[in-house]
């Protein structure tokens, strides 16, 4: 399976459309969204192209291909609009004998990794892309942000296929 991994949409439909175009062109099987889907949040500027209703419509059309977790800007009212679950702090993805912990990053991240039998933590929240390992050999993947990248980065996301990240 080929997974598209991203986070921090923050209600920006043009950013989501670019990612969904990639999803289709690269023939990804599933997408994992690490939170902050509809709301731009009180600390961010209002994104150009904000369209919460458009975000909901586009993602609901792909609901059977989405695994998502709750970000710090996601609310219970958002769940009422979405046809896929988003309210959990984390989810486990098992593929090719490896276990991946999917989370937003505001609770669990590389500085606060929960104990558990997983091979890699995948998160967003900081809007800073990262691909590394900790001292225990667990993978650390921060998908950055497709809407508000920080650190001079361009919008970022990742793919996972056969245990390899790109």
Regions from the language model: what does each represent?
Residues 1-13, 28-32, 140, 151-166:
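Amphipathic repeat-derived elements
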Residues 2-95:
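Core catalytic region of metal-dependent phosphoesterases/phosphodiesterases
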Residues 88, 99-101, 106-166:
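Conserved beta-sheet core of the metallophosphoesterase superfamily
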